[in-house]
């Protein structure tokens, strides 16, 4: 198949592949777990990394998820941009009126924070990015401490270099090591010193997406497997996944 760039690719279509393998792949991704599929030289699919001679193994990982804890225009702008970009976004807000605004903007998951001592249960996974967008010492310390004990691949906090240094010092005084606090990015964003909420949102989201791509990047490969299936009762958001391969 010729490409507009002047190159070409070969395409192999498997029209009647095993639906059970595709469904198992979907279910595992929907539960935020990575999954591998092996394609044998005969064209059959198998779940998992199978050491079959001549087979190719493809790995699929969960999509990026973003959790934002904060208040004000910065939080809302980032959540709105991330949602428009197709990123599953959770917004944790202290202000009930802002929570209503977020729901009107179409943010899928909005939680109202009550007191620092009663945070929502942490459900971050290795493909979750967490951003702190609040300037309150008690909330900062508690929210960052919670994020640090979790597996989020990205932890960031809005604020200046001086503010970031003070945050890390406070966390170290309550028992976190320097190595642990080094996980926190600050100041956040690919472009420094953004002042308005919209520009800051673009800068921060770009940094998060870059960090996610670095985490999931595979070695360059000449082969990719795209899963495109039409199965009843399976949300479209998980029907299409693609991945590069390694030799099984």
Please provide the spans of the model-predicted regions.
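Phosphate-bearing ligand-interacting subdomains
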Residues: 111-173, 201, 209
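Adenosine-phosphate binding glycine-rich loop
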Residues: 152, 158-248
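Short, flexible segments with low predicted structural confidence
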Residues: 50-54, 118-119, 175-176
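Residue-level recognition of short, well-ordered coil/turn positions
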Residues: 33, 87, 151-152, 176
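Alpha-helix N-cap/helix-start motif
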Residues: 100-103, 140, 164, 197
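Segments forming oxygen-rich coordination pockets for charged ligands
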Residues: 1-111, 125-129, 207-248
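A short acidic, often aromatic-flanked loop/helix-cap motif at beta-alpha or helix-coil junctions
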Residues: 19, 116-119, 189-195
